[in-house]
Every structure is written in structure tokens, then in C-alpha cells.
Curated annotation (Swiss-Prot):
A zinc finger (C2HC LYAR-type) spans 1-26, 28-52. It comes from Homo sapiens. The N-terminal zinc-finger domains are required for the appropriate production of 28S rRNA and the formation of pre-60S particles. One of its GO terms (cellular component) is cytoplasm. This is Cell growth-regulating nucleolar protein. The keyword Coiled coil applies. InterPro entries: LYAR, Znf-ACC, Znf_C2H2_LYAR, Znf_C2H2_sf. Keywords: Cell projection, Coiled coil, Cytoplasm, DNA-binding, Immunity, Innate immunity, Isopeptide bond, Metal-binding, Nucleus, Phosphoprotein, Repeat, Repressor, rRNA processing, Transcription, Transcription regulation, Ubl conjugation, Zinc, Zinc-finger. Its main location: nucleus. GO terms for biological process: erythrocyte development; innate immune response; negative regulation of innate immune response; negative regulation of transcription by RNA polymerase II; positive regulation of phagocytosis; positive regulation of transcription by RNA polymerase I; rRNA processing. The keyword Repressor applies. It comes from the Eukaryota. Residues 161-307 are annotated as: Disordered. Residues 229-239 have a biased composition (Acidic residues).
Length: 379
């Protein structure tokens, strides 16, 4: 976008706003460009479409600015607009619009963007006029490439000396040349894709080769193992060629046998320890059994027979030993069950069944009295 300064009032104005500023500032006769400093009298500012950049301004004498592709296309587009204004078959409304468009340096080159730009910048909302303007542009753009092709064609057909030489060249060389030309024409992306595909193919081929080699190496090993197994089953000795493999298999078997023997020994030791621990526990429990009162004869209830358990007698004996013939249910239960396990050889009943029997014996027997969490012996 080009900016000007008014020489009369000194205000900076955009190129689009110059006409509005002239109607306000009556003494405005000359405008000077802010970037390049040139003076423009009257309507000469309309031809000043583009100015130098800051790099060109402050770059020095030897500076050469880079030409951008977009700028070249934009300049060609604006030139096309100025050529369309000179056409005789253009309506006056469209011509006025084209003159306004030529003052801008950022005219879009696609239909949708061009029409939106016309609506926003030039305030033209009539779609028929917009379509007319765009049709003129499209006709001009389509006619240009045809003219260029006609100019590029030679007037007289010139004999091609390479054609005669190519007929003598063999077909293989011609194919190579065509392939080389095709490779040159390809983009960087296509080349990259081809390289990646080649790498993938090479990797797949290497994997297949490695897999085949591994399978070949594994097959003879399996056969050797099968032969050894057959020979061992038949009672024959393994040949000297396969002696190392046979020794390994024998060593493995010996190790397995020794490991199984050790496990058996360890298991037997553990069982012995458990049995000894059980015996010591039973002895301790027998020591804790209630003793007979001094000078008195033992009661029939307190001497249970081996194998059967006397619930009533054991409970009575434990309560007699307790102070005031009274003990908590928890302690009583613990002592009674301990006595039960020592007396009975085989534990056929579960702990839940034993607890049910214990509760029945306490609650239903009149000699025992329950006081909250305690049991008392009634004399």
C-alpha cells in the first residue's frame, strides 16, 4: 500500500483516500510519496501503484532487491486490467469499475475472493455487474495462453537433425533417455517417496532372506534331536558324531533326578518337623489339664476317655480351677477347644460345628449360669 503526504496541510493519506482528502483540503495540488519522496501533481499519483521497500531505501547503492513471484503475477494482472479498459465493447459502468480497480495493487486473482474484495473495497453489491467484470477477466486470461502458443510456434517447419539420428539409435538407449527425462521432471516429493519405497522393499527382502536362513538352520537341529530320541527309546547308543548332544541330554536328566530327590528329602524333613511340633503342643496341653483336688477322688466327668470328648466334665473342671468358679466365655471356649484337639485323634468336625456344640452345652446345662460375658459354676 502506497502512502502520500499533502503538501498543503501535511497530512498523510492512503492512495484510496486521496479523492476524499482533495474534497476536504481545497489547497491540495501536489502529493509526495512517503517512501520514495517523489512529487505528484494533479492525477499523476494514480500511476504510482507500487513504491520501494525499506530494504531498498536503506540498503545502499549496490542493493538489488529480490523479485517475488507473487509481485510479478500481480503486476501482470494489473496490466491486464489496464488493457481491458481500452476495449471498445465494455459498458461505461464496468469501465468505471475497472479504472477504480487499476488504482489498487492487491487485486485478487480468483473469482470468490475477487467478488468479496469488490464488495468490501469498492462497495459493489450488484451480482450481475460483478459477474460481468469477472467474465471479462476470464476471457482475457483464457485468450492470452492461446496467443503465446501461436507466437512460440515457428513460421516454417525446420528439419530436425536429431530425428534422423534417433532412428539409428537402438530402442534400449531410447528408453533409457526417456526414463532419464521423466526422472528430471519429477518433483522433490515424488523422488522422496520413491526412495522411501525402495528402502522398504530392500528391508523386506533382507527380512525374508534372514527368515529363510534361520528356518534352514533350525530344520537339521530338529532332525538330530528326533534321531537321538528314537535311538534312546530303542536302547541303542548314540553315534560318536552326535556324542556331545547325547551327553547334554544325559546331564539334563541327571540334574532333574537330583532336583526331584532333593525336593523329596526337603518335603520329608518338613513333615517330620511338623509332626514333632504337633507332639510338643499336645504334651504342653496335657500338662495344662486340670489336676484332681488333693485328698479327693476324681469325678467321673473329669476323666474323659481317649477318643471321645466329655464336654460337661472339661467345662466343670476349668470352672473349678477359676477364681470364684467364674470365667469369661472367650477364655473358657479357648481352653475347651484346646482340650478337644488333644483328646480326639482325628478332627472330623469343623470349628463352626464345635462352637455350636459348646454354646449348647453352656446354655442348656443348669449347672452353668451365664452372666453377660461370663460363665459361673452353680454348686
Amino acid at each position: 500500500m502506497v502512502f502520500f503526504t499533502c503538501n498543503a496541510c501535511g497530512e498523510s493519506v492512503k492512495k484510496i483516500q486521496v479523492e476524499k482528502h482533495v474534497s476536504v483540503c481545497r489547497n491540495c495540488e501536489c502529493l509526495s510519496c512517503i517512501d520514495c519522496g517523489k512529487d505528484f501533481w494533479g492525477d499523476d499519483y494514480k500511476n504510482h501503484v507500487k513504491c520501494i521497500s525499506e530494504d531498498q531505501k536503506y540498503g545502499g547503492k549496490g542493493y538489488e532487491g529480490k523479485t517475488h513471484k507473487g509481485d510479478i503475477k500481480q503486476q501482470a494482472w494489473i496490466q491486464k486490467i489496464s488493457e481491458l479498459i481500452k476495449r471498445p465493447n465494455v459498458s461505461p459502468k464496468v469501465r468505471e469499475l475497472l479504472e477504480q480497480i487499476s488504482a489498487f495493487d492487491n487485486v485478487p486473482r480468483k473469482k470468490a475472493k475477487f467478488q468479496n474484495w469488490m464488495k468490501n473495497s469498492l462497495k459493489v453489491h450488484n451480482e450481475s455487474i460483478l459477474d460481468q467484470v469477472w467474465n471479462i477477466f476470464s476471457e482475457a486470461s483464457n485468450s492470452e495462453p492461446v496467443n503465446k502458443e501461436q507466437d512460440q510456434r515457428p513460421l516454417h517447419p525446420v528439419a530436425n537433425p536429431h530425428a534422423e539420428i534417433s532412428t539409428k539409435v537402438p530402442a534400449s538407449k531410447v528408453k533409457d533417455a526417456v526414463e532419464q527425462q521423466g526422472e528430471v521432471k519429477k518433483n522433490k516429493r515424488e523422488r522422496k517417496e520413491e526412495r522411501q519405497k525402495k528402502r522398504k522393499r530392500e528391508k523386506k527382502e533382507l527380512k525374508l532372506e534372514n527368515h529363510q536362513e534361520n528356518s534352514r538352520n533350525q530344520k537339521p537341529k530338529k532332525r538330530k534331536k528326533g534321531q537321538e530320541a528314537d535311538l534312546e527309546a530303542g536302547g541303542e547308543e548314540v553315534p560318536e558324531a552326535n556324542g556331545s548332544a547325547g551327553k547334554r541330554s544325559k546331564k539334563k536328566k541327571q540334574r532333574k533326578d537330583s532336583a526331584s530327590e532333593e525336593e523329596a528329602r526337603v518335603g520329608a524333613g518338613k513333615r517330620k518337623r511338623r509332626h514333632s511340633e504337633v507332639e510338643t503342643d499336645s504334651k504342653k496341653k496335657k500338662m495344662k489339664l486340670p489336676e484332681h483336688p488333693e485328698g479327693g477322688e476324681p469325678e467321673d466327668d473329669e476323666a474323659p476317655a481317649k477318643g471321645k470328648f466329655n464336654w460337661k466334665g472339661t467345662i466343670k473342671a476349668i470352672l473349678k480351677q477359676a477364681p470364684d468358679n467364674e470365667i469369661t466365655i472367650k477364655k473358657l471356649r479357648k481352653k475347651v477347644l484346646a482340650q478337644y484337639y488333644t483328646v480326639t485323634d482325628e478332627h472330623h468336625r469343623s470349628e463352626e460345628e464345635l462352637l455350636v456344640i459348646f454354646n449348647k452345652k453352656i446354655s442348656k446345662n443348669p449347672t452353668f449360669k451365664l452372666l453377660k460375658d461370663k460363665v459361673k459354676l452353680v454348686k
